[in-house]
Amino acid sequence: MAAAIALLDEEGVDGLNMRDLGQRLGAAATAVYWHVSSKDNVIALATDAVWAEIAVPPAPRPGMWRPSAEAFARSAYDMVCRHPWLWPAISASFAYGVGMARHQEQTYAIFQAAGFEGRELDGAVNTYSVFIFSASQGVAAAFALRARLKRSGEDAQHLMAELNQRAEAVATAFPALRERMAAHSHAPLSDDDRFAFGLDVVLDGLEARLRKSRALARKTEPTAGQ
């Protein structure tokens, strides 16, 4: 499976073929089919395997769930950035296996330890997970474009320069956008910086939500003697 993952990392889902995989393994494509029935099966197996790369943090101590959530989010984000073909593969094949399920179980454990329950727990896990994997979409889009240009033989650097020029031309009609694009051209914000900022905002919001839920629960508790 390591050879398939490495090939996907280089070529993406559309660039994967059994002949190239066989060459990496030192075998004919027909021999590969003895082990996996199809390209879709290879993608499904590779998709499930990469989830194991996410480092599982220790069980959070009472009141200390946030460091676990931060470490788990960072490891998940890094994994998806290493394998930017993952989400296109999931979307194309509806792949859902033990690896992804285990990741979801571990995410629930972190937010259960924080004190979320019921629908609040579901909402916290969903908000956290959607942010992590949405944050990687820029990396995935850039990878898909590079892979497509590589297959077509186009000059990626020249095309990106043209796209940036077009974006700047469009932005001139929008003052706030024009100002921020100019600022970013001098001091660009890295993908990691954007991720760290967004994760802080999400976890700040979830902490505030948890405090609000607890305060509401205290208000609705029956008083002594009732």
What positions do the PLM features span?
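C-terminal peripheral helix-coil segments that are non-catalytic and often amphipathic
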Residues: 141-226
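Amphipathic alpha-helical segments used for helix-helix packing
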Residues: 47, 77-99, 105-106, 137-145, ...
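Hydrophobic recognition helices of helix-based DNA-binding modules
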Residues: 46, 50, 54, 132-136, ...
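Helix-turn-helix
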Residues: 3, 7-41, 45
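Hydrophobic alpha-helical connector segments
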Residues: 56-102, 118-128
